[in-house]
Design a protein with these regions (language model features):
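N-terminal auxiliary segments of SAM/dcSAM-dependent transferases
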Residues: 1-73
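SAM-dependent Rossmann-like transferase core, predominantly class I methyltransferases
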Residues: 44, 58-132, 137-148
C-alpha cells in the first residue's frame, strides 16, 4: 500500500496538499481496491493488476488537469448518501448539507412544500425527503444531462 500511496503523493503533490491530498489518495485507493477505510490503514501489500494500473494513471492524469475526483468517479457523498454526479451538475458541498440540516430543524414539525429549481443531482430534494417525510417536495432541472 505504501508504494501506491507514495506514487499518488508524488504525482499529485503541488496540485493538492495536506488533508485534501490525504483524503483524495484514501478515496482513490479504497475505491480502486474495493476496501473500506479501516482496511486501507491496515493493508500492507497491494499488487495492482495491469487494468488497475492503467485506470490509476488515467485518474492521475485527469486530476492533474484539474478535474474534480467526484466527476472522475461519477459520485459524491452528501448527507450520508451517495449521489451520481457528472460535469452537468454541481458537486454537493458541505455548506449545502448545512442548509439541509437547517431546513430540517426549522420544519421538523411542519408539512412544508419545497420546490428545488435547478436540482442537478437531486441531492437537496432527496436528502430533504428522507429527513422530512411529511414534506411535499418537487424538483426539476432544465438540463437533461443533469437528470441522468
Amino acid at each position: 500500500m505504501k508504494q501506491l500511496i507514495d506514487k499518488l503523493q508524488t504525482a499529485l503533490s503541488g496540485i493538492y496538499e495536506g488533508h485534501e491530498l490525504t483524503a483524495i489518495i484514501r478515496t482513490i485507493c479504497c475505491d480502486m481496491l474495493g476496501i473500506d477505510t479501516a482496511t486501507y490503514y491496515l493493508k500492507e501489500a497491494v499488487t495492482l493488476t495491469t487494468e488497475q494500473g492503467t485506470l490509476l494513471q488515467g485518474i492521475i492524469d485527469r486530476l492533474r488537469q484539474g478535474e474534480p475526483l467526484q466527476y472522475i468517479e461519477g459520485k459524491a457523498p452528501f448527507c450520508g448518501m451517495e449521489f451520481a454526479v457528472n460535469s452537468s451538475v454541481l458537486i454537493p458541498r458541505p455548506e449545502t448539507a448545512e442548509l439541509v440540516d437547517w431546513i430540517v430543524c426549522e420544519h421538523a414539525t411542519q408539512h412544508p412544500r419545497i420546490l428545488d429549481l435547478g436540482t442537478g443531482s437531486g441531492c437537496i430534494a432527496i436528502a430533504l425527503s428522507k429527513q422530512l417525510p411529511q414534506a411535499t417536495i418537487e424538483a426539476c432541472d432544465i438540463s437533461a444531462e443533469a437528470l441522468t
